[in-house]
């Protein structure tokens, strides 16, 4: 029996659409990666973040009190440098063109959709970076007088949420959330619950679908 050419044509048509959408999705995402990379390139934010998080793990896992104090003493300069660099980055990011700074609140990346989405389904990543900069700086300064372990835990959450925003900007929310879980074994909701109250209020207000 001869194959149903109309059905085959339909499947080929669908396949062509899927391949085309995947191509344009990758191109859009690569443009985002390059754009963010230009603003991040003057800084060592990612390297300092990794150094700090690794340092916290070594500090918390050290049994010798003297050695533990020595490790903690070296982390203060990293915290301060990271907060200062991210604040400068957030200031630089204000120069990002407004249309390119818009991020879809939808979980999946849909090619060509971003310029067509209503404002309530978009947020401005420049505002998100400003929220993260304030949150990181506030925890580093520790005006609330948190205990060292509580402060380290909260600062770690602030940094992970900031990293999630960077991935969301470049790859979409679903990919950012999956990366957070895969790399740090931490759900997005848990990170949001662990940042400072001010960061959480500002962040949730920004990403809410109003």
Question: What are these language model-derived features?
Answer:
Residues 42, 64, 68, 115-129, ...:
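Short, structured coil/loop segments at alpha-helix boundaries
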Residues 32, 36, 71, 89, ...:
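Generic structural signal of hydrophobic/aromatic residues within well-ordered alpha-helices
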Residues 146-210:
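Glycine-rich, aromatic-bearing surface loops/beta-hairpins
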Residues 46-64, 133, 137-144, 160-167:
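Regular secondary-structure segments
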């Amino acid at each position: 029996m001869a194959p149903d050419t109309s059905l085959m044509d339909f499947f080929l048509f669908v396949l062509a659409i899927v391949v085309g959408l995947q191509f344009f999705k990758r191109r859009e995402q690569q443009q985002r990666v390059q754009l963010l990379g230009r603003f991040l390139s003057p800084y060592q934010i990612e390297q300092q973040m990794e150094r700090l998080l690794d340092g916290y793990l070594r500090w918390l896992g050290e049994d010798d009190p003297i050695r533990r104090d020595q490790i903690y003493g070296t982390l203060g300069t990293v915290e301060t440098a990271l907060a200062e660099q991210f604040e400068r980055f957030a200031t630089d990011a204000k120069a990002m063109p407004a249309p390119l700074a818009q991020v879809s609140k939808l979980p999946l990346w849909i090619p060509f959709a971003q310029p067509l989405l209503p404002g309530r389904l978009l947020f401005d990543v420049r505002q998100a970076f400003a929220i993260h900069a304030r949150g990181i700086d506030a925890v580093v300064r520790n005006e609330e007088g948190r205990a060292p372990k509580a402060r380290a835990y909260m600062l770690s959450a602030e940094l992970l949420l900031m990293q999630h925003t960077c991935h969301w900007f470049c790859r979409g929310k679903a990919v950012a959330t999956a990366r957070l879980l895969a790399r740090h074994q931490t759900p997005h909701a848990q990170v949001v619950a662990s940042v400072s109250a001010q960061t959480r209020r500002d962040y949730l207000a920004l990403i809410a679908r109003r």
